[in-house]
Amino acid sequence: MRMYKMMGLGLAILLSLSVTGCGVKQVAMSGEGESYAVVDATGQKVKIPGKPKRILGNSASIDTMLLGVVTADHLVGATEADRDPAISYIAEDTKDIPMTIPLSGLSMELVTQARPDLVVASTYTKGEELTMYRNLGIPVVVIDGPRSIQQVKDDVRIIAAAVGEKERGENVIREMDRQLKEVDDTLGARTDKKPVVYLV
């Protein structure tokens, strides 16, 4: 039970980090430079021509992780969930992104309209959707649908590598670790206290 609570806390911390950006507001990505390769969560080696300027995440959780390492002006689409302040920590960050991705998902028309130079998807993404991106010649990086704190960290590292910001990804993970330890220490101190019973 505690593991699931800590995983939820880790995701919440990641959400808060995407808002503060860990200093990400100063990022300037050119989209130029040498190509590089990234190995995604499926073991696929993905060649990326240079730092992407037009990035498309296909879920709210992916957009949240992306905003931990890049600024919102690098995202070419935002999901309906991203924009809902009742459930999203990134509603304010994504309000000016022109394209809204409906809950029904991305169509070929929307993808061609967005013209992304990188798509970030997850292992929950349908195979035909991944095939659509690849048939359009777009590099696709797949992350795990996280089921643990470690997978959240692995996903952040893959995304950071894909956008050419590895060090920024490590900064996010270090801050996650710091906050998780702080909370774990606090919880541990509370559970270590033995109840005292007075008999009269």
PLM regions with names:
Residues 54, 58, 67, 103-106, ...:
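Extracytoplasmic/periplasmic, Sec-exported soluble proteins
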Residues 10-18:
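Bacterial N-terminal signal peptides
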Residues 41-43, 60-61, 80-83, 124-125, ...:
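Solvent-exposed coil/turn segments that connect beta secondary-structure elements
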Residues 36-47, 52, 76, 118-121, ...:
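Extracytoplasmic/periplasmic mature domains of Sec-exported, cell-envelope-associated bacterial proteins
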Residues 57-114, 118-123:
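A short, structured surface patch at a secondary-structure boundary
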Residues 2, 6, 21-64, 167-198:
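Bacterial Sec-exported substrate-binding components of ABC uptake systems
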Residues 33, 41-43, 50-53, 70, ...:
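Extracytoplasmic
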Residues 128-200:
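Extracytoplasmic substrate-binding proteins
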